[in-house]
Every structure is written in structure tokens, then in C-alpha cells.
């Protein structure tokens, strides 16, 4: 069994702190992401409801769960935002036009989680930390480096994020193109990107969060991902948050690889 290192970065309120993957074929997904990012897997037990975590150099960096058989749920990566008391976040989400899906769920002593939809329909989670405040690594190859929220309801979602999580936004829109902004947590640090899905996008693309995992060089990382069976959606591109590419994994789950711009 891999050793577990629970030393993690300090995540302020409202910051993306964890991601997990919901898929039908867990074993296939584990093989894909192990080969791509070098992850090892720590199997869950009864106390965590079978929740399995990906480890990188002993640090927890992501989770994985199996979809219920026949459930009408897309395979997807979920971004979790850090909160204090999850019941307070639950009330705020519903009060500001979002919708919580079910009740808070404990993952043993690690954390309590809650899944919700924002007013634009994007699926996300909130994370009340216990023994696990979040991902043990950031910006290292194979670990989470950035998150982006894409929405068709830009103004309402921006107001929702401000009301629930206190996020302030710096507008980054250029030359009359689709609106986008950088969200900041209360400490002033950048937390994630917010981008508008405008009429140029295909209508079938839903609002969603995209988790980006760090790499040192996007070209060989992309080639490796494609060789493992990923599908290229967009890129490579030189974007506002680094050089990256958007991909879909074995079950169509969307994620990004990114050489982060840490300047």
C-alpha cells in the first residue's frame, strides 16, 4: 500500500482544493491516469465508502468513484471549492440561485462534501476539510494547477460566486471577444478562470468546470495522452494561464494539461 502524506498547501475559503473523477470503468481510468501522470492508487475502505485516492509522491492529488449502474450521469471531473461549515455553504448556494443535489456526505475523517449546480447549470462540489484539506501538491507535474468555469449565464454565475464564496473578479476580456475573468479569493490570490460560452460554441456543450493538471512540456504530454487513448478537443494553445491542451479521457471526461504560468 502506498504511503500517504497529508501535508498540504493552505487553501483559503472558496478556493478550488480538490478534484475527483466519476466514471463507470474505474480500473480503465486508473490505468489511463497512472500511465499519463504517474499516479498510484490508495484504495478506500468501509470508512470512506470505498473512496479511492490518486497519490503522487505519496501526496493525495485526486479521487475516483464508480458511477452507479444505469445512472444518467456523465463521466466527469468535479472541482471542489473549500468551505468552512458545509451547512452554511449549503444554505448560501440555495439562497443565491444554485441548487444542492442531496445532502452533505462524509468521506470518513477526510472531509465532508456536497454536490451542487450553479445558476448556469454547472456541476461542482464543496469541500469541508477534515484530515484532508485538499490536494497535497499544486503546480507540480501530474498535480492540479488550475481550474476554469465555462458558462452561458456569465453575469448570474459571477454574482453567485461572489455571494456564496466571496470571489472578486478581474475582467480579462480582449477585443470584444467572449467575456472572461480571473476569480480571486478573499486573500487576493487568483483562484480560477471564468469564461463565457458564447454563440460561437456548439449548443450541445454544457456549462462545466475544467480541471487542469500540470506538465513541464505540453507537446510530449499531449502525444502520450493521445497514445493512451485520449481525444484532443482543443490546442495546443498559449492561453492566459499557460500553454495547454484540452482533452477527453477514456469515458469522455474533459480535462486539461497545462504548463502553468507561475510568474
PLM regions with names:
Residues 36-43, 67, 83-86:
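Generic N-terminal helix/loop capping motif
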Residues 6, 11-59, 95, 103-111, ...:
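Core segments of cupin and vicinal oxygen chelate
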Residues 38, 210, 256:
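Extracellular/lumenal glycan-associated surfaces
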Residues 28-29, 43, 70, 89, ...:
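A generic structural micro-environment signature
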Residues 1-11, 15-24, 52-53, 68-92, 94-148, 170-190, 196-201, ...:
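Vicinal oxygen chelate
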Residues 58-65, 193-194:
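Short, flexible domain-boundary/linker segments around small modular repeats
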Amino acid at each position: 500500500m502506498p504511503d500517504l502524506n497529508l501535508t498540504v498547501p493552505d487553501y483559503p475559503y472558496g478556493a478550488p482544493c480538490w478534484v475527483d473523477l466519476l466514471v463507470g470503468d474505474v480500473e480503465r481510468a486508473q490505468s489511463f491516469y497512472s500511465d499519463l501522470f504517474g499516479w498510484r492508487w490508495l484504495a478506500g475502505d468501509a470508512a470512506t465508502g470505498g473512496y479511492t485516492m490518486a497519490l503522487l509522491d505519496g501526496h493525495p492529488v485526486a479521487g475516483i468513484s464508480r458511477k452507479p449502474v444505469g445512472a444518467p450521469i456523465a463521466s466527469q471531473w468535479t472541482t471542489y471549492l473549500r468551505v468552512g461549515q458545509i451547512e452554511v455553504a449549503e444554505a448560501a448556494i440555495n439562497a443565491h440561485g444554485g441548487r444542492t443535489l442531496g445532502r452533505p456526505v462524509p468521506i470518513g475523517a477526510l472531509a465532508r462534501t456536497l454536490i451542487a449546480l450553479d445558476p448556469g447549470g454547472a456541476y461542482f462540489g464543496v469541500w469541508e476539510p477534515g484530515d484532508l484539506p485538499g490536494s497535497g501538491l499544486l503546480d507540480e507535474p501530474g498535480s492540479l494547477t488550475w481550474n476554469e468555469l465555462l458558462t452561458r449565464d456569465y453575469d448570474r454565475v459571477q454574482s453567485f460566486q461572489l455571494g456564496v464564496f466571496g470571489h472578486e473578479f478581474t475582467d480579462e476580456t480582449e477585443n470584444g471577444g467572449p467575456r472572461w475573468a480571473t476569480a480571486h479569493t478573499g486573500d487576493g490570490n487568483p483562484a480560477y478562470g471564468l469564461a463565457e460560452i458564447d454563440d460561437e460554441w456548439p449548443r450541445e456543450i454544457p456549462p462545466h468546470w475544467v480541471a487542469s493538471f500540470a506538465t513541464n512540456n505540453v507537446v510530449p504530454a499531449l502525444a502520450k495522452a493521445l497514445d493512451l487513448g485520449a481525444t484532443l478537443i482543443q490546442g495546443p494553445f498559449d492561453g492566459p494561464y499557460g500553454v495547454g491542451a484540452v482533452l477527453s479521457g477514456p469515458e469522455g471526461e474533459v480535462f486539461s494539461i497545462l504548463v502553468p504560468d507561475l510568474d
